[in-house]
A protein has these predicted regions:
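Nucleotidyltransferase catalytic core that binds NTPs
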Residues: 2-228
Length: 228
């Protein structure tokens, strides 16, 4: 299968018109967080972001968009897509029934995040989307292609990650859109707000990272696939 969903039938009037084509079982009126990455491999840090977003933003679903290849990263050490999808499914299952793991970028043929998000929004009218990112990504967000368009396309929630607290709070993207920042105490309103709107969510930090996991496995001579 090319997508994973562990939950009950979604609320609303049924799946959006694009659901059968892209594997995203979403209905109008749902509040949905989108979190993209290579998941090479998926780990507890990814789950931490999902759990925090579900709880603090009041989301109905979190979708992990597993990229065929991150254009900003080397492909040399990237595991095959099917292995990374399996890794993401295994970790998503620990979060709960609100998780969806999708290869939407492969299906849609998009490469850059802004193009992927535009395609998701176009295929799922009526869904309230929020782009999720760790604070480590916010520090370099201004280097992403079309990053200001992302900020204006949907609300953004930044979840604290280890080692990036100071840089992310003073990041160029945070400064550029400072007047659109929503207090964390009002984060539950974010999915219903018109973009640009963003918030920064502090939470107990999880220090797991894909890079550290790959390095540890390489040192032990293990395969990169975290699924036995």
């Amino acid at each position: 299968m090319s997508f994973f969903h562990a939950g009950p039938a979604p609320k609303g009037s049924g799946p959006c018109r694009g659901a059968l084509r892209d594997g995203l079982d979403l209905a109008p009126g749902m509040k949905v967080g989108l979190f993209g990455g290579s998941f090479n491999p998926a780990h507890d840090g990814h789950a931490h972001v999902a759990r925090t977003a579900l709880r603090r933003l009041g989301l109905d679903r979190v979708v992990w968009l597993v990229s065929p290849q991150n254009p900003l990263k080397s492909s040399r050490d990237t595991a095959p897509l099917d292995e990374r999808m399996a890794s993401a499914r295994a970790v998503a299952a620990t979060v709960g029934p609100a998780m969806i793991v999708s290869d939407f970028e492969t299906r849609a043929g998009t490469r850059w995040t802004i193009d992927t998000l535009r395609a998701v929004v176009a295929r799922h009218p009526g869904v309230q989307f929020v782009w999720l990112m760790g604070s480590d990504n916010l520090a370099d967000f201004h280097r992403w292609r079309g990053w200001t368009d992302i900020m204006r396309l949907m609300p953004v929630a930044v979840i604290a990650r280890p080692g990036s607290l100071l840089d992310s709070r003073t990041a160029p993207a945070a400064a550029r859109f400072a007047r659109y920042r929503v207090p964390a105490a009002q984060a539950g309103l974010l999915p219903s707000l018109e973009a640009p709107a963003w918030t920064y969510l502090s939470a107990p930090l999880n220090h797991r990272s894909s890079t550290a996991i790959r390095a540890a496995r390489a040192g032990r001579g293990e395969e990169s696939n975290p699924i036995g």
